């Protein structure tokens, strides 16, 4: 089984995002935050967004390993510049820069 170990910073972000119907994780990098929230049933769905395809590919692989890729959409974009961004009821921008 896939195991998520969030850093204290990401764990704090996760607490604020709990209960979201659609979370946008901007600058998702590895995708640990939305994956953890989905695995624990704390959110309904998420968009993992990153401007770089390499980290986004890593997030996609982690989601497949965790078995939650059906509830996670991947967008290679700048910030919230993806279709349907206005439908997100929670946004996390953590660890950028």
Question: Can you describe what each PLM-predicted range is?
Answer:
Residues 87-94:
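Short SAM/SAH-binding signature in class I
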Residues 20-29:
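Conserved class I S-adenosyl-L-methionine
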Residues 52-54:
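Conserved SAM/SAH-binding beta-strand->alpha-helix loop
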Residues 31, 35:
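Glycine-rich SAM-binding Motif I of class I
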Residues 60-85:
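S-adenosyl-L-methionine
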Residues 45-50:
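Conserved SAM-binding motif I beta-strand of class I
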Residues 4-20:
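Conserved alpha-helix/loop element of class I SAM-dependent methyltransferases that forms part
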Residues 38-39:
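Gly/Ala-rich phosphate-binding loop of Rossmann-like dinucleotide-binding domains
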């Amino acid at each position: 089984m896939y195991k998520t170990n969030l850093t204290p910073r990401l764990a704090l972000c996760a607490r604020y995002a709990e209960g979201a119907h659609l979370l946008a994780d901007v600058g998702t990098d590895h995708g640990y935050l939305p994956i953890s929230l989905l695995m624990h049933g704390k959110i309904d769905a998420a968009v993992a967004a990153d401007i770089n395809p390499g980290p986004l590919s890593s997030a996609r692989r982690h989601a497949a390993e965790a078995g939650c890729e059906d509830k996670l959409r991947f967008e290679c974009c700048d910030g919230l510049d993806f279709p349907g961004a206005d439908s997100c009821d929670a946004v996390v921008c953590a660890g950028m820069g």
